[in-house]
Amino acid sequence: MKLLSFGEVLWDIYPDKKCLGGAPLNFAAHFVKAGGEADIITAVGNDSLGAETLEGIRRLGVGTGCVAEVNAPTGRCLVTLDENSVPTYDLLSGVAYDMIPPPKDCGDFDVLYFGTLALRSGENLCTVRRLLERCDGKTVFVDMNIRPPFYTSETVRFALSNADIVKLSDEELPTVFETVFGRECPVAEDAAARLADGFGGCKLMIVTRGGNGAFAYDCRGKEFYRCGAVKAEVVSTVGAGDSFGAVFLHSYLSGRGVADCLAAASIAAARVVACAEAVPQ
């Protein structure tokens, strides 16, 4: 099965190193590790980091045929980790991934992925609209990936209204709920159900809860599925949500039940948090 992953590819700059990242790339790489195929739709700059980015994407097994080169610096993000290894991101604006043009030919595919961060630019919003026109009969997976201040009511609603499957964290859920409904968020499961039922195309809403596991709401059957977290010694949570979503999606498209998909995704996320890399080799 083939994934098209749209959005930011950037370098996470730590005090002592730099790592290639961005949720769409991490997601695509984990989808490939799960047994699928993936191409990334993004843009890099005509600079040394741009060339390094292309090499890094290919090493992860992700296709680069839909990567554009634009007249802007390759994306960067300054990252710090707190005492619990939770990352804080300082995302630079006006970078290459803010200027992603529609690919001329992205070939056949089964599923499109995007998140809200790359929608911070009007150009990218137009590109996603064009991609969605090619998604008749395809699955659309949205990772909300809320990064203040890079979201608006328009982009949140746009993402939710075009998604078959939505993934977000329990930390993002109140922000998304209050952005959509303009009132305080109820308990997590009620909030997820109201959000999902409020957008007719949504089939599944997945909420990750860190050390408390995850749950999924099946909008068609009005049923909740829950899964506890797999125990792991946490080194870094960077990439854990991406691995969770990618493995869930691959399992789901392979015909597995929602409960089994949650279990497989939880195992994958536990492996990632035990490593320093967002995509462990």
Segments from the language model and where they lie:
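Conserved beta-alpha-beta core of the PfkB/ribokinase-like small-molecule kinase fold
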Residues: 111, 116-190, 212-213
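Structural alpha-helical scaffold elements that stabilize or flank donor/cofactor-binding regions
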Residues: 105, 158-159, 198
